[in-house]
């Protein structure tokens, strides 16, 4: 087991959106013991339940196309793109991000959740969370759900900074051991 906090930098709660990249509750409980952080991703395919289902189907479609056209990436890409256009991800609403935060807090505690928006690598984002300028909406949603100012600061930055500092301490300790 890791002697340093584990950071899931771009994951969410699997109990809400069943995607393989998301973190199941049994692992969330271990994250709490490890003092790690699950940083909620904003990609609709990871956080919106219906979109996560489409993503799971999408993997199977892609594998099937690769078997159908083993020597033609062009054909795979063409049919895959057509399938994607017929099966768009529902974007969802900003509240789904707060739902994931709530779930991680419920299972692992307020010290184990952060934000891993992934704005530079995603295509579909819940409405209201289009870029970092929309964070005040998420802050407002958290206030409405009873989070304190300190809790919100933990989610926005304090938890991941704490975990990174603990990782640095663990690395120094391990590097000084024979």
Regions from the PLM with identified roles:
Residues 40-45, 107-130:
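Short acidic/histidine-rich active-site segments
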């Amino acid at each position: 087991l890791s002697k340093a906090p584990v950071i899931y930098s771009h994951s969410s709660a699997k109990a809400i959106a069943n995607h393989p990249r998301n973190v199941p509750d049994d692992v969330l409980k271990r994250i709490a013991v490890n003092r790690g952080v699950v940083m909620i991703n904003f990609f609709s395919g990871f956080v919106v339940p219906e979109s996560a289902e489409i993503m799971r189907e999408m993997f199977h479609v892609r594998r099937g196309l690769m078997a159908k056209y083993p020597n033609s990436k062009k054909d795979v890409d063409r049919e895959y793109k057509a399938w994607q256009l017929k099966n768009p991800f529902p974007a969802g609403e900003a509240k789904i991000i707060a739902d994931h935060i709530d779930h991680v807090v419920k299972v692992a505690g307020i010290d184990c959740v952060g934000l891993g928006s992934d704005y530079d690598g995603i295509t579909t984002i819940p409405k209201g969370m289009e870029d970092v300028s929309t964070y005040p909406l998420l802050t407002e949603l958290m206030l409405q759900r009873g989070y304190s100012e300190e809790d919100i600061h933990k989610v926005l930055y304090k938890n991941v900074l704490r975990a990174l500092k603990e990782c640095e301490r663990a690395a120094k300790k391990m590097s000084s051991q024979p």
